[in-house]
Structures are given as structure tokens and as C-alpha cells.
Amino acid sequence: NNSSAAVESVDATVVEKKQGIYTHMQSEAHVPWFRVVFEMTDGSLMEFQIQQGDFRELEKGDRGMLTYQGNRYICYQKYKFKSEAQEEEKC
């Protein structure tokens, strides 16, 4: 349950972006989906479904602070300089 999970913020790099169209079975509506894979500093990968606006802002190779709760994406604050982690405002 995401609501009982702790909110965590970790240093992470965008390693993959995925998008596609989901067709709703009953209404046959076509709904776009957007997912991003992040690599943590320990090498582990986490994948989250995100909103289209956030998806457009992220580029493969971006480094920043990923905030999430369980398997729910909250936000990603890109570092101004890709070469080093630094304190940024929380998103």
C-alpha cells in the first residue's frame, strides 16, 4: 500500500523513457501512458508511471533527486550541474 510506505528521496539518473497508448477495454478509449526508469546510486532500477508534462521535462542522462512513495512517483528535481549532486529545493 503506497499510503503506508515512507516517502523517500534518493539521488537517481534517468536511464530510459517509455511511452505508448493503452486502449480501455470497455470504452475503447485510447489513453496515452508515460513511464521513466531511474537508476539509483547503488545500481538498482526503479520504474514509475508519470504525467505527460513531467515526461517531457526529463531527458535520458538527467541526474537529480527522485522522490517517491512505494511504487508511486512524486517528483524529480534535476540537478543544475550533471557532474555533481548538490542541494536543491524539494519539489
Task: Identify the residue ranges that each predicted region occupies.
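N-terminal signal-anchor transmembrane alpha helix of single-pass membrane proteins
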Residues: 1-2
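Structural detector for short beta-strands of small beta-barrel domains
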Residues: 5-28
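Well-ordered beta-strand positions in beta-sheet-rich domains
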Residues: 9-11, 45-47, 63-65
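OB-fold (S1/OB) nucleic-acid-binding surfaces
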Residues: 25-46
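A short, compositionally biased micro-patch
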Residues: 39-41, 51, 69
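Beta-strand/loop nucleic-acid-binding surfaces
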Residues: 43-57
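A membrane-cytosol interface segment of integral membrane proteins
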Residues: 57-91
